[in-house]
Amino acid sequence: MAREGLTLRCTDCKMENYITKKNKKTKPEKIEVKKHCHKCNKHTLHREKK
């Protein structure tokens, strides 16, 4: 299937906080979203883990 699971990692503390899915055929680029990090206790940029 084209839709695969992935992990979002905080760019500040490198903690893996969120698990999501994306369609790799329609969105081949890496995901970047601002989400709340529980360790940093603030909104930070989360990127797709390699």
UniProtKB/Swiss-Prot annotation:
Source organism, top-level taxon: Bacteria
InterPro entries hit by this protein: Ribosomal_bL33 (IPR001705), Ribosomal_bL33_CS (IPR018264), Ribosomal_bL33_sf (IPR038584), Ribosomal_zn-bd (IPR011332)
Molecular function in Gene Ontology: structural constituent of ribosome
Keywords: Ribonucleoprotein, Ribosomal protein
Cellular component GO terms, alphabetical: cytoplasm; ribonucleoprotein complex; ribosome
One of the Pfam families matching this protein, by short name: Ribosomal_L33
Gene Ontology biological process terms from the UniProt entry: translation
Family: Belongs to the bacterial ribosomal protein bL33 family.
NCBIfam families the UniProt entry points to: PRK00504.1 (NF001764), PRK00595.1 (NF001860), rpmG_bact (TIGR01023)
Protein name (database record): Large ribosomal subunit protein bL33B
Biological source species: Mesomycoplasma hyopneumoniae (strain 7448)
